[in-house]
C-alpha cells in the first residue's frame, strides 16, 4: 500500500510541474516518450505489485495522459529537435557499448561486472527479449543479488498477462529465493501470490508461500516481523469464521519467537482477540522476551557496524553454535553470507556444519552448489561438493559434469588442480569393485589417471611453469592401487620408473617408498635392485639407504649378496665423503675471501679516518693563519695558487648577484679575482642565518598536523605551491617548510590544519606526484618518544584480489596499464611503484573488485608482451619483512662478555667504527637513539684509572708544530 500511496502522491506533483499546455506540446511529448520508457515500466511494476492484475482498469493506475504530462515536464527545458538529436547520439553510444560488452563476455564469460553493465544498458534501451536472455545467462553462472532479482521480477511482473506468464514469474521467484536469504524477495513473493488467489488452488498457493517464507526468514529478528504481519493481514482479510483460528495460530506462533517489537504484537493480539489470551501463550511470550535480551547485544553490534560486518557475524555464529538450535544456526549463516558471499572460509564452515549435523540432502547440496557459484576459485569448496554428492548418492554423470566445471573454474595455484584431481580420482577408486578382474569402472579409473597426468603436464605446467605435483603424488597413488588392489606390479614398476625420472631419484624417501611397495607386493630380487639403484642415486641421506640395504642382506641375502652390498655402500659413502670435503673446502675458501675483503675494507676505512683526524688537527693553525693574513688575503692567493680556500655560505640572497669575476688562469684554468675576503663572506652567511625564520614545533598539535617529505629541493615558495593541494582536505592554518642554514629548502615541511579530520583526510594524499616526485604524507609523530613508529599504508600479506606485475617497461603509464587490466575486470586501484625521485621501477599493483577477476587476469596477462617487454603477473603476496632481532649479549672466547653494538636511527655510520680490538672492549651503557642522525658511539673505558684531561685546539696546534 505504501507503493500506491507514493504513486498517487507523485501524480499531482507531476501535474504541478507540467504547467499550462503550449501549442507545440504534442511534438515535445512525442520526443520525450522514449526518455520515460524505463520509468513507466518501473511505475507499472510497482503499481501491479500493489493493485493486482486489474491495475490498468483502476482509477489509481498510471494513465497515458499522466505519462504525457510527465514527458512534457521532462522535455520543457529543450526543444524537440535538440532532444531528438541528443537522444539519437546517446542511443548510438549505448549500442556500441552493448556490442563491446557482448564481445567481452564471449571472451570471458566469468566477468561479473560485464554482465551487470550489459543488463543495465539493455534495460535502458528497452530490449526486453535480450535483457531476459542476458539475465538468464548471468543467473546460470553467478548467484544474483537481491537488487538484481527484484529488478528482474518487477520487469517480468509488468509483462505478465495470463496464467502461463504468472507461472513463469512463480518459477523466477523460486530461483530467486535459492541464491541468498532475502526477506524482501519472500515478501514480494507472498504479495504476488495473493494476486492469483482467484485461480484454482490460489489460496493453498498463498499459504504455502507464506509458510515457506516463515520457515526461511521468520526467525530474522529485524526483518522477520514484516512477513508475520503480511501473513496475518492476509488471513484476517478472509472473514470466514473458520479462518479466525488460523489468525490465532499465527499470533501464537509469532509471540513464541524472539523478534523486535514483540510488545506491540502482543498488544495488537490483546486488542484483536475477543477471548482472554491463554496462559500458555503468555508463558511462551515471556520466554521469548528473555531470549530476546540474550540476542540483543549481537543484533545491536550488527546495527552499529558497517558492512560486511564479518567479525560481528562470526561472534553471532559462535553464540548460536553454543545454543545449538539448527534453524537459528542456519539463519545466521545465511544472514552472514548475504554480505560476505565472497568469503570462502564462511562457506566452508557452513557446509561443514550441514554435512556433519543436519545431513539433509537437498539442503546440503544446495548450499554446496551456492558456495562454488560464489567462490569458484576456491578448490576446497569444489572437493567438498564432490564428497557431498557422493555421500548423498548423486548420479555419476552429474558428479563428472561438476568435476569438469571445476577444471574450468580458474584456480590461482597449480596445487589446486592437483587437489581437485585427487578428490575426483578418490571418488572413482571408491566406485571400483576390485574383486572383479576387469570392469568398466576400473578402466574409467585408469583413463582418469592417464588424463590427470597429461592435464597437469600440458595445461597446468604451461600456465604456472610448474605441475603442482613435484613429488608425483598422483602417480604414487596409482602405483599403490595397481600393486595392492589390482595385483599388477609390472604397471606399478613402470609408474615408479617414471616418478624417478622426474627429478625424484636423489631423494632417499622416494626410494624407500618404492622399496616398501616392492617389499609388500613384489619380490626380493626387485627389492634388492631398487636399493642398489637408491645407493647410487641418493644424495640427501645416502647413509640411511645404505643401512637399509645392509639390513636386508643381513636377513635375506647370501654371502655373495652381502659382499656386493658392502662394496657398493663403502664405495658410495667414500665418494660422498670426498664430495662433502671438497664442498667444505670450497665453502671455507669463499669464507676466507670474504674475510680478506672485509679486512681490506676495514683498513681502508681506518686509513681514511686517520687522514680525516689529521685534517682536523691542522684546522686551528689554518684558521689562525687565515685570520692573520686577512688584510693581505688577495696577495696570498696569488702567491699560493695551489691552495684553495673553502668559501662558506657564499650563496647570495634573493635579488643580489655574487661579486666574483673569473679570469683565465695558467694552463687554461680559471682564477678568481676581486673576491671578497672571508670576513665579509662570514658576515653575509650570518645575515642569511638571521633572515631564516626558526621553526618551533608544538607537539600538542600533532593530531592536527601532518609531516610532508620527499619534496623537490628545487621547489620555490613551498607554502604557495602546497597550500592549494592541502586546502582541498580542509582549512590550512600554517605550512612550515624547513630550510638549511644557507636558505636551501630541505624537501620537507609540516602542514597544520584547523580540524583533526582534515589531517586524517590529508594522509590519503600520500604518494601524490608533486613536480615529478612522489610526496610522502605521514602522521606527525615524535620519533624520540616512539622510535619504532613506522607507517606503511599497503598490506604485506596475501591479497587474492590484488595482482603484482613485474617486468613493465619504464615508459608504461598508469593509464596505459589500466586500459589493459580493465579488459579482465573492474579495476578498483592501480599503483605504479616508483623510487623516491618518482622514476618508475617497472613494477605495479592492480586491485580488482573480487578474487575471481584477479585469478582470470593472472591467467590472461601472465607472459603478455607490453612494448617489447614480457611481463610477469602473480597474486600479490609480498615476502615477510625482516624484523631486527632483539640484541643479546655474547661472550668472547676466553674473554669478557661483550654487549651488542648500538646504532642510531640511521644505522651504522662510518664514524662509529671502533679501532679498539674486541678483546679489550668493555661493556658500556647503550647510547640512546638520536632523532635525526646516528646516536653517539658508546664510550670505551681507557686502561688508565683516571681519564686524561681534554686538550684544546691550541694544544693540538703545538703538537703539530713539534713535528
Curated annotation (Swiss-Prot):
<comment type="subunit">
    <text>Component of the 7SK snRNP complex at least composed of P-TEFb (composed of CDK9 and CCNT1/cyclin-T1), HEXIM1, HEXIM2, BCDIN3, SART3 proteins and 7SK and U6 snRNAs. Interacts with AGO1 and AGO2. Interacts with PRPF3 and USP4; the interaction with PRPF3 is direct and recruits USP4 to its substrate PRPF3. Interacts with USP15; the interaction is direct.</text>
</comment>
<feature type="modified residue" description="Phosphoserine">
    <location>
        <position position="852"/>
    </location>
</feature>
<dbReference type="GO" id="GO:0000244">
    <property type="term" value="P:spliceosomal tri-snRNP complex assembly"/>
</dbReference>
<feature type="repeat" description="HAT 2">
    <location>
        <begin position="164"/>
        <end position="195"/>
    </location>
</feature>
<keyword id="KW-0963">Cytoplasm</keyword>
<feature type="repeat" description="HAT 1">
    <location>
        <begin position="126"/>
        <end position="158"/>
    </location>
</feature>
<keyword id="KW-0539">Nucleus</keyword>
<feature type="region of interest" description="Mediates interaction with PRPF3">
    <location>
        <begin position="2"/>
        <end position="351"/>
    </location>
</feature>
<protein>
    <recommendedName>
        <fullName>Spliceosome associated factor 3, U4/U6 recycling protein</fullName>
    </recommendedName>
</protein>
<dbReference type="GO" id="GO:0005654">
    <property type="term" value="C:nucleoplasm"/>
</dbReference>
<dbReference type="Pfam" id="PF05391">
    <property type="entry name" value="Lsm_interact"/>
</dbReference>
<feature type="region of interest" description="Necessary and sufficient for U6 snRNA binding">
    <location>
        <begin position="537"/>
        <end position="953"/>
    </location>
</feature>
<feature type="modified residue" description="Phosphoserine">
    <location>
        <position position="215"/>
    </location>
</feature>
<dbReference type="GO" id="GO:0005634">
    <property type="term" value="C:nucleus"/>
</dbReference>
<dbReference type="GO" id="GO:0005737">
    <property type="term" value="C:cytoplasm"/>
</dbReference>
<feature type="region of interest" description="Disordered">
    <location>
        <begin position="608"/>
        <end position="712"/>
    </location>
</feature>
<dbReference type="Pfam" id="PF00076">
    <property type="entry name" value="RRM_1"/>
</dbReference>
<feature type="region of interest" description="Disordered">
    <location>
        <begin position="1"/>
        <end position="36"/>
    </location>
</feature>
<dbReference type="GO" id="GO:0000398">
    <property type="term" value="P:mRNA splicing, via spliceosome"/>
</dbReference>
<feature type="modified residue" description="Phosphoserine">
    <location>
        <position position="769"/>
    </location>
</feature>
<feature type="region of interest" description="Required for nuclear localization">
    <location>
        <begin position="600"/>
        <end position="670"/>
    </location>
</feature>
<dbReference type="InterPro" id="IPR034218">
    <property type="entry name" value="SART3_RRM2"/>
</dbReference>
<feature type="repeat" description="HAT 4">
    <location>
        <begin position="242"/>
        <end position="275"/>
    </location>
</feature>
<feature type="repeat" description="HAT 5">
    <location>
        <begin position="324"/>
        <end position="356"/>
    </location>
</feature>
<keyword id="KW-0507">mRNA processing</keyword>
<feature type="modified residue" description="Omega-N-methylarginine">
    <location>
        <position position="906"/>
    </location>
</feature>
<dbReference type="Pfam" id="PF16605">
    <property type="entry name" value="LSM_int_assoc"/>
</dbReference>
<keyword id="KW-0508">mRNA splicing</keyword>
<feature type="repeat" description="HAT 8">
    <location>
        <begin position="487"/>
        <end position="520"/>
    </location>
</feature>
<dbReference type="GO" id="GO:0006334">
    <property type="term" value="P:nucleosome assembly"/>
</dbReference>
<comment type="function">
    <text>U6 snRNP-binding protein that functions as a recycling factor of the splicing machinery. Promotes the initial reassembly of U4 and U6 snRNPs following their ejection from the spliceosome during its maturation. Also binds U6atac snRNPs and may function as a recycling factor for U4atac/U6atac spliceosomal snRNP, an initial step in the assembly of U12-type spliceosomal complex. The U12-type spliceosomal complex plays a role in the splicing of introns with non-canonical splice sites. May also function as a substrate-targeting factor for deubiquitinases like USP4 and USP15.</text>
</comment>
<feature type="repeat" description="HAT 6">
    <location>
        <begin position="359"/>
        <end position="391"/>
    </location>
</feature>
<feature type="compositionally biased region" description="Acidic residues">
    <location>
        <begin position="57"/>
        <end position="69"/>
    </location>
</feature>
<dbReference type="InterPro" id="IPR011990">
    <property type="entry name" value="TPR-like_helical_dom_sf"/>
</dbReference>
<dbReference type="InterPro" id="IPR008669">
    <property type="entry name" value="LSM_interact"/>
</dbReference>
<dbReference type="GO" id="GO:0015030">
    <property type="term" value="C:Cajal body"/>
</dbReference>
<feature type="modified residue" description="Phosphoserine">
    <location>
        <position position="795"/>
    </location>
</feature>
<feature type="coiled-coil region">
    <location>
        <begin position="82"/>
        <end position="110"/>
    </location>
</feature>
<feature type="modified residue" description="Phosphoserine">
    <location>
        <position position="10"/>
    </location>
</feature>
<keyword id="KW-0007">Acetylation</keyword>
<feature type="compositionally biased region" description="Low complexity">
    <location>
        <begin position="1"/>
        <end position="11"/>
    </location>
</feature>
<keyword id="KW-0175">Coiled coil</keyword>
Amino acid at each position: 500500500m505504501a507503493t500506491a500511496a507514493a504513486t498517487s502522491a507523485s501524480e499531482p506533483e507531476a501535474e504541478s510541474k507540467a504547467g499550462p499546455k503550449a501549442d507545440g506540446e504534442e511534438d515535445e511529448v512525442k520526443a520525450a516518450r522514449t526518455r520515460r520508457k524505463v520509468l513507466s515500466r518501473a511505475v507499472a511494476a510497482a503499481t501491479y505489485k500493489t493493485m493486482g492484475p486489474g491495475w490498468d482498469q483502476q482509477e489509481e493506475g498510471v494513465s497515458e495522459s499522466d505519462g504525457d504530462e510527465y514527458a512534457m515536464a521532462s522535455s520543457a527545458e529543450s526543444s524537440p529537435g535538440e532532444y531528438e538529436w541528443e537522444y539519437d547520439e546517446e542511443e548510438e553510444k549505448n549500442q556500441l557499448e552493448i556490442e563491446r560488452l557482448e564481445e567481452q563476455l564471449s571472451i570471458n564469460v566469468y566477468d561479473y561486472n560485464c554482465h551487470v553493465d550489459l543488463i543495465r544498458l539493455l534495460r535502458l534501451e528497452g530490449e526486453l527479449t535480450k535483457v531476459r536472455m542476458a539475465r538468464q545467462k548471468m543467473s546460470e553462472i553467478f548467484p544474483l543479488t537481491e537488487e538484481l532479482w527484484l529488478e528482474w521480477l518487477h520487469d517480468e511482473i509488468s509483462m505478465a498477462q495470463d496464467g502461463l506468464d504468472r507461472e513463469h514469474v512463480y518459477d523466477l521467484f523460486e530461483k530467486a529465493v535459492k541464491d541468498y536469504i532475502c526477506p524482501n524477495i519472500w515478501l514480494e513473493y507472498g504479495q504476488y501470490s495473493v494476486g492469483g488467489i482467484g485461480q484454482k488452488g490460489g489460496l493453498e498457493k498463498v499459504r504455502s508461500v507464506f509458510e515457506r517464507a516463515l520457515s526461511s526468514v521468520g526467525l530474522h529478528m529485524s526483518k522477520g516481523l514484516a512477513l508475520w504481519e503480511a501473513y496475518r493481514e492476509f488471513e484476517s482479510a478472509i472473514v470466514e469464521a473458520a479462518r479466525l483460528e488460523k489468525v490465532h495460530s499465527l499470533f501464537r506462533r509469532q509471540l513464541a519467537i524472539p523478534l523486535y517489537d514483540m510488545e506491540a504484537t502482543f498488544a495488537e493480539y490483546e486488542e484483536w482477540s475477543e477471548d482472554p489470551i491463554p496462559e500458555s501463550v503468555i508463558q511462551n511470550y515471556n520466554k521469548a522476551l528473555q531470549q530476546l535480551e540474550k540476542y540483543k547485544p549481537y543484533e545491536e553490534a550488527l546495527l552499529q557496524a558497517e558492512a560486511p560486518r564479518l567479525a560481528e557475524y562470526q561472534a553471532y555464529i559462535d553464540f548460536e553454535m553454543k545454543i545449538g538450535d539448527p534453524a537459528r544456526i542456519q539463519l545466521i549463516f545465511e544472514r552472514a553470507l548475504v554480505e560476505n558471499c565472497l568469503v570462502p572460509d564462511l562457506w566452508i564452515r557452513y557446509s561443514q556444519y550441514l554435512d556433519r549435523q543436519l545431513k539433509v540432502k537437498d539442503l546440503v547440496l544446495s548450499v554446496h552448489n551456492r558456495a562454488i557459484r560464489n567462490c569458484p576459485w576456491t578448490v576446497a569448496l569444489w572437493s567438498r561438493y564432490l564428497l557431498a554428492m557422493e555421500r548423498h548418492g548423486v548420479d555419476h554423470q552429474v558428479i563428472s559434469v561438476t568435476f569438469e566445471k571445476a577444471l574450468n573454474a580458474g584456480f590461482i595455484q597449480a596445487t589446486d588442480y592437483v587437489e581437485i584431481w585427487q578428490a575426483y580420482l578418490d571418488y572413482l577408486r571408491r566406485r571400483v569393485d576390485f574383486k572383479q578382474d576387469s570392469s568398466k569402472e576400473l578402466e574409467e579409473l585408469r583413463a582418469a589417471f592417464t588424463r590427470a597426468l597429461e592435464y597437469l603436464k600440458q595445461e597446468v605446467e604451461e600456465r604456472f611453469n610448474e605441475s603442482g605435483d613435484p613429488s608425483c603424488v598422483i602417480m604414487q597413488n596409482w602405483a599403490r592401487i595397481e600393486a595392492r588392489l589390482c595385483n599388477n606390479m609390472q604397471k606399478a614398476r613402470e609408474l615408479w620408473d617414471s616418478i624417478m625420472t622426474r627429478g625424484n631419484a636423489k631423494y632417499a624417501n622416494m626410494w624407500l617408498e618404492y622399496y616398501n611397495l616392492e617389499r609388500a607386493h613384489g619380490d626380493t630380487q626387485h627389492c634388492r635392485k631398487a636399493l642398489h639403484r637408491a645407493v647410487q642415486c641418493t644424495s640427501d641421506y645416502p647413509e640411511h639407504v645404505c643401512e637399509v640395504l645392509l639390513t636386508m642382506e643381513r636377513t635375506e641375502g647370501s654371502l655373495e649378496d652381502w659382499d656386493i652390498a658392502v662394496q657398493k655402500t663403502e664405495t658410495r659413502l667414500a665418494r660422498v665423503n670426498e664430495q662433502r670435503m671438497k664442498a667444505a673446502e670450497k665453502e671455507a675458501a669463499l669464507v676466507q675471501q670474504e674475510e680478506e675483503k672485509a679486512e681490506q675494507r676495514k683498513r681502508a676505512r681506518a686509513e681514511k679516518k686517520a687522514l680525516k683526524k689529521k685534517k682536523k688537527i691542522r684546522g686551528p693553525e689554518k684558521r689562525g693563519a687565515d685570520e692573520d693574513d686577512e688584510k693581505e688575503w688577495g696577495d696570498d692567493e696569488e702567491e699560493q695558487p695551489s691552495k684553495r680556500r673553502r668559501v662558506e655560505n657564499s650563496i647570495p640572497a634573493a635579488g643580489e648577484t655574487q661579486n666574483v669575476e673569473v679570469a683565465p688562469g695558467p694552463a687554461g684554468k680559471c682564477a678568481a679575482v676581486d673576491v671578497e675576503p672571508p670576513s665579509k663572506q662570514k658576515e653575509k652567511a650570518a645575515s642569511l642565518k638571521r633572515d631564516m625564520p626558526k621553526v618551533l614545533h608544538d607537539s600538542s598539535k600533532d593530531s592536527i598536523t601532518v609531516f610532508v617529505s620527499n619534496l623537490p629541493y628545487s621547489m620555490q615558495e613551498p607554502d604557495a605551491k602546497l597550500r592549494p593541494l592541502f586546502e582541498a582536505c580542509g582549512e590550512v592554518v600554517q605550512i612550515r617548510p624547513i630550510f638549511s642554514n644557507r636558505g636551501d629548502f630541505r624537501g620537507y615541511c609540516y602542514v597544520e590544519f584547523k580540524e583533526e579530520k582534515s589531517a586524517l583526510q590529508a594522509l590519503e594524499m600520500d604518494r601524490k606526484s608533486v613536480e615529478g616526485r612522489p610526496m610522502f604524507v605521514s602522521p606527525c609523530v615524535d620519533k624520540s618518544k616512539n622510535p619504532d613508529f613506522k607507517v606503511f599504508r599497503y598490506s604485506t600479506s596475501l591479497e587474492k584480489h590484488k595482482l603484482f606485475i613485474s617486468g613493465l617497461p619504464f615508459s608504461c603509464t598508469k593509464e596505459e596499464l589500466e586500459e589493459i587490466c580493465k579488459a579482465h575486470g573492474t579495476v578498483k586501484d592501480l599503483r605504479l611503484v616508483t623510487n623516491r625521485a618518482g622514476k618508475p621501477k617497472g613494477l605495479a599493483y592492480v586491485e580488482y573488485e573480487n578474487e575471481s577477476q584477479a585469478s582470470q587476469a593472472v591467467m590472461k596477462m601472465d607472459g603478455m608482451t607490453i612494448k617489447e617487454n614480457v611481463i610477469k603477473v602473480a597474486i600479490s603476496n609480498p615476502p615477510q619483512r625482516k624484523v631486527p632481532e632483539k640484541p643479546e649479549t655474547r661472550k668472547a672466547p676466553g674473554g669478557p662478555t661483550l654487549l651488542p653494538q648500538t646504532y642510531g636511527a640511521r644505522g651504522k655510520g662510518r664514524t662509529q667504527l671502533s679501532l679498539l680490538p674486541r678483546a679489550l672492549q668493555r661493556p658500556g651503557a647503550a647510547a640512546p637513539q638520536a632523532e635525526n642522525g646516528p646516536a653517539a658511539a658508546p664510550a670505551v673505558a681507557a686502561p688508565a684509572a683516571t681519564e686524561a684531561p681534554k686538550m684544546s685546539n691550541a694544544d693540538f696546534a703545538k703538537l703539530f708544530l713539534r713535528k
